UniProtKB/Swiss-Prot annotation:
Residues 16-121 form the Core-binding (CB) domain. Keywords: Cell cycle, Cell division, Chromosome partition, Cytoplasm, DNA integration, DNA recombination, DNA-binding. Its main location: cytoplasm. Site-specific tyrosine recombinase, which acts by catalyzing the cutting and rejoining of the recombining DNA molecules. Essential to convert dimers of the bacterial chromosome into monomers to permit their segregation at cell division. The lineage of its organism: Bacteria, Bacillati, Bacillota, Bacilli, Lactobacillales. This is Tyrosine recombinase XerS.
């Protein structure tokens, strides 16, 4: 979603919210939480407060009038009723007869509410230096996590990874084979952004950065000589990330055409640009998602940018057998998240043995 559209939607939701949610928003913006995260949280609060009004828990006329005392006095039974409402209510999508939202969606809603309650009961300070209230009902609410072993998850993911020669094979396909399948009109459109598209995909495959980290890169964040990029990780932490050498020619080719192709000025600091009505703008995450989906589906299997992150992590673990190194590369504080890649690599080794 383009940043301008995202901010517009955030503003519309903020206009609906009670004063204490607006304080929460401002506080998390200072952390900083990303605008995307805050937008998703505001949507969850809109869903929750709408239910509060519909269920009669508050007799306020509108969401912005719901007093803080409603949250303070919310019972565990009330929260469980809300969860049941989410699980059993008819979906808004008229094309399905499925009842309720998924457990993943419910967990996301509860996570957003837990964050708000933690702020109100622990983090915020009133005039006396105390939180607004102390009773946190969310600590009494249990969530059900999706049960899946690492082995099962590895099996599901590995078919969507570009391992071994497929990493550079994917880039070569986009560069040389994909254009041959296009009509003259489609080829003209492809050539306008070919260098940029290849540079973005090469960077994702060579660094393992998150999509948000890649699209938020500025020109100054790329050190092509050292093959290092400076990114803003989750929670606003800055980090320097090494980039594999195979991405260098793709980045060089893009930088060679960036200024002229995208009509840049000194104020255009974003590394990856798109041209809209002759004006350069930072490329947005949804555009990259669509681009990766299109090229990957034509090459092998439709994947997301996050699967390119998994690809880099798996290849790096296969080469080093070091979960610590992989954790550092991905920006994780713990090696627990990288356990997945040991299972994927073990399966790959077994397949190699079976072929002997």
């Amino acid at each position: 979603m383009k940043r301008e559209i995202l901010l517009e939607r955030i503003d519309k939701l903020k206009q609906l919210m009670p004063w204490y949610v607006l304080e929460y928003y401002q506080s998390k913006l200072a952390v900083p939480y990303s605008f995307t995260t805050l937008y998703e949280y505001l949507k969850e609060y809109d869903r929750f407060f709408s239910w509060v009004l519909e269920s009669g828990i508050s007799n306020a006329d509108k969401i912005s009038d719901i007093p803080l005392s409603v949250l303070e006095n919310m019972s565990k039974k009330d929260m469980e009723s809300f969860i049941l409402y989410l699980r059993e209510r008819p979906l808004l999508n008229a094309n399905t007869t499925k009842q309720g939202v998924s457990q993943t969606t419910i967990n996301r809603t509860l996570s957003a509410l837990s964050s708000l309650y933690k702020y109100l009961t622990e983090e915020v300070e009133n005039d006396q230096g105390e939180p607004y209230f102390y009773r946190n009902v969310m600590k009494k609410v249990s969530t059900k996590k999706k049960k899946e072993t690492l082995a099962a998850r590895a099996e599901n993911i590995k078919q969507k990874l570009f391992l071994g020669d497929e990493t550079e094979g994917f880039l070569t396909y986009i560069d040389q084979e994909h254009p041959q399948q296009l009509s003259n009109r489609a080829l003209s459109s492809f050539n306008k952004n070919k260098e940029r598209d290849l540079a973005i995909i090469a960077l994702l495959l060579a660094s393992g950065v998150r999509l948000s980290e890649a699209v938020n890169l500025d020109l100054r964040d790329l050190n092509l000589k050292m093959m290092v990029i400076d990114v803003t990780r989750k929670g606003g932490k800055r980090d320097s990330v090494n980039v594999a050498a195979f991405a260098k020619p793709y980045l060089e080719n893009y930088l060679a055409i960036r200024n002229q192709r995208y009509k840049t000025e000194k104020t255009d600091t974003a590394l990856f640009l798109t041209l809209y009505r002759g004006v350069p703008n930072r490329i947005d995450a949804s555009s990259v998602e669509k681009m990766v989906a299109k090229y990957s589906e034509d090459f092998k299997v439709r994947v997301t940018p996050h699967k390119l992150r998994h690809t880099l992590a798996t290849r790096l673990y296969d080469a080093t057998k070091s979960q610590v190194l992989v954790s550092h590369q991905l920006g994780h504080a713990s090696t627990q998240v990288t356990d997945l890649y040991t299972h994927i690599v073990s399966d790959e080794q077994k397949n190699a043995l079976d072929s002997l």
